Amino acid sequence: MNPANHSQVAGFVLLGLSQVWELRFVFFTVFSAVYFMTVVGNLLIVVIVTSDPHLHTTMYFLLGNLSFLDFCYSSITAPRMLVDLLSGNPTISFGGCLTQLFFFHFIGGIKIFLLTVMAYDRYIAISQPLHYTLIMNQTVCALLMAASWVGGFIHSIVQIALTIQLPFCGPDKLDNFYCDVPQLIKLACTDTFVLELLMVSNNGLVTLMCFLVLLGSYTALLVMLRSHSREGRSKALSTCASHIAVVTLIFVPCIYVYTRPFRTFPMDKAVSVLYTIVTPMLNPAIYTLRNKEVIMAMKKLWRRKKDPIGPLEHRPLH
């Protein structure tokens, strides 16, 4: 097909999860609850980490940032998906599609780099506990966080730069509930073989490099923990287990989607729902379920909300 003979499409039709109204209503009900829990769970962690002085440490600073990013990440796709499920008219403009694509990869890239920073933080905390506060000081922490944001921005800009030059002259039906590279690139009315290689290389490089760093960090930690006491080993494994669970939930779907040729497989939409909608909801529960410090901070916040003036004996007499 010669793109010169066809006009550029004004937008795309998102095919979504289903065309059947009854199924769309069920999906709307379920994912509304999931998104509500995502917002409440992640923002609650941000509030707790910010308000409790005992949690003003590097580990909880990074956790608070991850929760904020999970809230943003889910908000890029979930609200629009919910509206489209009810409206039955899931169209998105070309500019809106590129905007969603940019922020999706921007926040997603930051999360990938941040998880790598969190693994490094745990490695230093366990391998060099006496020097931990010197190595992971506020300046280093801020620089690593800034590097994660810059890395996410560069990664996203590459995606946009490679996509925006493509001619889209029809068809305009995008087989997903949000705009992403694998589905979008298949609608281009030109040969995209070289472009697919570039995008797979870019996504694969970011994902696999970070995953290998994480794998190396935790392999070294597991070897190191053999020499620790039972109590120290148990506490370290508890912290690492939470992080490994989150890493698995994020990296495995990303590797499945972005490090292979852009072809459609039956599991694609289910995997997309997992890492864009479900995983951001699970992360707060995974990190707080066995974390005594966060649970204590939650209880303090709840008591403060119930009794904002303070205990009866400390109230002023009038």
From Swiss-Prot:
Residues spanning the membrane: 26-49, 58-79, 101-120, 140-158, 196-219, 236-258, 270-289
GO molecular function, one term: G protein-coupled receptor activity
Organism: Homo sapiens
Compartment annotation: Cell membrane
Protein's name according to its UniProt entry: Olfactory receptor 4D5
Assigned protein family: Belongs to the G-protein coupled receptor 1 family.
Glycosylation sites recorded in the entry for this protein: 5
Alphabetic keyword roster: Cell membrane, Disulfide bond, G-protein coupled receptor, Glycoprotein, Membrane, Olfaction, Receptor, Sensory transduction, Transducer, Transmembrane, Transmembrane helix
Gene name in the database record: OR4D5
Lineage, highest ranks first: Eukaryota, Metazoa, Chordata, Craniata, Vertebrata
